[in-house]
């Protein structure tokens, strides 16, 4: 059986509720996120209000995905050919989940069973603050970014 992040957090919240403890907010921090800081956690927490139920970290793709390519049967072509002549600096930034942490007001989280509801905001990070850790190369990049951040 695969347990998802939300299932685990819902179970923890249920166990605490059984013990008479309830929380207004919940935060999930990934153990593989080496650049999480107290300042960024406070910043994300501060974004939640009457209109925002959840906040998670995101980062812009390093190159516009509008100019992305795919290879089919050995031939390369643009995914979005309408952007063939567009300058990369003129294209809208597109973001992806940075996989660091997720904040939510507890009641909407329990109701929707997700950190990503319709009232979710993103906390945009710089590329220096984000590094996936799946390979040895990823680890080496994280070390280099750490050095740059702490000069």
Predicted stretch roles:
Residues 32, 54-57, 105, 135:
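Generic structural signal for small/hydrophobic residues in well-ordered secondary structure
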Residues 21-32:
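Short beta-strand-to-loop acidic/aromatic patch adjacent to the donor-nucleotide binding site
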Residues 74-93:
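Short, flexible, basic/aromatic active-site loop/helix in glycosyltransferases
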Residues 7-12, 40-43, 47, 141:
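Alpha-helical elements of Rossmann-like donor-binding domains used by nucleotide-donor carbohydrate transfer enzymes
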Residues 7, 94-151:
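Conserved alpha/beta core of the MobA/IspD/sugar-nucleotide pyrophosphorylase nucleotidyltransferase superfamily
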Residues 14-20:
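Phosphate/pyrophosphate-binding loops at sites that engage ATP/ADP/AMP, CoA/4′-phosphopantetheine
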Residues 38-65, 72-75:
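Basic phosphate/pyrophosphate-binding loop/patch that engages nucleotide-derived ligands
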Residues 2-3:
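Short, small-residue-biased leader/transition segments that mark boundaries at the very start
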